[in-house]
Amino acid sequence: MANTSKVVKAARGHKFAVQNYNRCSRCGRARGYYRFFGMCRICIRELAHKGELPGVKKASW
């Protein structure tokens, strides 16, 4: 889990736009971020398994 201070620091933004980075809206994780969902891969997986993400289903081929 990310520290609260890191989440607040990321939300403030930087002087240069290149230095800004995304964090998961649920847990604050910085890596494995999916922009479409605004969450990290772990949170997306948890919500998808619970059926709380509409239109997302487990792949099978």
Curated annotation (Swiss-Prot):
PROSITE patterns in UniProt: RIBOSOMAL_S14 (PS00527)
Names of required cofactors: Zn(2+)
Range of residues in the leader sequence: none
Matches recorded under InterPro entries: Ribosomal_uS14, Ribosomal_uS14_bact, Ribosomal_uS14_CS, Ribosomal_uS14_sf
Any one biological process term the GO annotation gives: translation
Domain of life: Bacteria
Gene Ontology molecular-function annotations: rRNA binding; structural constituent of ribosome; zinc ion binding
Membrane spanning stretches: none
One GO CC annotation: cytoplasm
Comment on bound cofactor: Binds 1 zinc ion per subunit.
Binding site for Zn(2+): C24, C27, C40, C43
Keyword Protein biosynthesis: no
Sorted UniProt keywords: Metal-binding, Ribonucleoprotein, Ribosomal protein, RNA-binding, rRNA-binding, Zinc
Keyword RNA-binding attributed: yes
Functional description taken from the UniProt entry: Binds 16S rRNA, required for the assembly of 30S particles and may also be responsible for determining the conformation of the 16S rRNA at the A site.
Record family assignment: Belongs to the universal ribosomal protein uS14 family. Zinc-binding uS14 subfamily.
Subunit structure: Part of the 30S ribosomal subunit. Contacts proteins S3 and S10.
Record protein name field: Small ribosomal subunit protein uS14
